[in-house]
Amino acid sequence: MITQLLCLNILNFVLIEVALIRVNPYFSLIPIRLVGNRIYSFKEAKIMTKIFIIHENSDWLPPFAEALEAEGVEWEEWPLIEGTLDLDAPPPAGIFYSRMSASSHSRGHTASKDYTRSVLSWLESHGRTVVNGRRVVEMEMSKIDQHTALRAAGFEVPATIAVFGHHNLKDQARSMKLPFITKHNQGGKGLGVRRFDDFKSFDEYVDGPDYERPVDEITLLQEYLHPAGGFITRVEIIGGEFLYALTADTSAGFELCPADECADPGTSLELCPVSALPTESLFHWREGFEDPIINRYLDFCQSWGIGIAGFEFIETEDGRLVTYDINTNTNYNPVVEKEAGRSGPVLVARYLAALARELKTDRVLVPTG
């Protein structure tokens, strides 16, 4: 009985000291001798914090949800469609990954862009870790921002004229070489992407019922690039590492269509060929791709604070390598992933989990003898 009471008292003392350590980590650094002459001391340990995924389209989340669950991390989705934001309250502790899409308005989520801007500004003002934060969301929402940033970094980009409003489109088109393409400044899914081989058909489009008005009233007129080999390439980057490159077949030409109408709607390529059929995949792993452009994209991501992105480029018939799009809201293609033997969602989950482990430390009891 005396021995049992002694053991109980020792255990109570340890539990009390552990509780006090949680309140005041400087309470004691003295090793504690437990039953069996084992000595325990307090040491720092990495403890994972919560991951929040900011988005506006739940249909794109399942692969990431599955990967995060498999990684064993605590996570929560944060849809920014409609809501409120208490600017006087601090944000929750955690890692925040923004998957806001430039095509959000096409799903009726017209408030999502500015909602996300506000939330990211709020998070960053409180020092929270944000993957693809405030600076990056501006690049996602504006192809002008992408174009100017890429050009400033020394990348070759397509000749482009930005037209603000509707009335000058036909006049400005006359300064373009034929053929040329149009696209929306705030796009995604190939919004507003069309090819024109003559000015008459362009004029008819602008004046006709099929004209697609850009949500931000900015239309880009851009040179048409003739791809050598009949494909375009996209390079995927996650957490400062090259994942893989994929190709999209353009052999049937480049009268372009929205990605949602193509064979692989989960692949958020900016350019998607009209030849897409429901029974085939136009997207494949580009095996053995080791071009120096990869390291340049990695450097660009580091410079701009981009954690996760896809860069699209065309190798032209006249020998140019032209980068035309940056997508910071990648949806990974299952056909490509099977061919490459690598999973984008899995590596995203591991990247976020590593950030979460780095963010928080705590002091725990560990045996020392």
Language-model features and meaning:
Residues 7, 17, 22-27:
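Intrinsically disordered, low-complexity proline-rich regions
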Residues 56-159:
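Conserved N-proximal alpha/beta basic substrate-recognition cap immediately N-terminal to
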Residues 288, 302-306, 315-369:
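C-terminal active-site "lid" helix and adjoining low-complexity regulatory extension at the edge
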Residues 29, 34-47:
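Short, Lys/Arg-enriched N-terminal segments with co-localized hydrophobic residues
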Residues 194-301:
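Phosphate-binding site of ATP-dependent enzymes
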Residues 49-52, 125-127, 134-231, 291, ...:
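Active-site nucleotide/adenylate-binding loops and adjacent lid/helix of ATP-dependent enzymes
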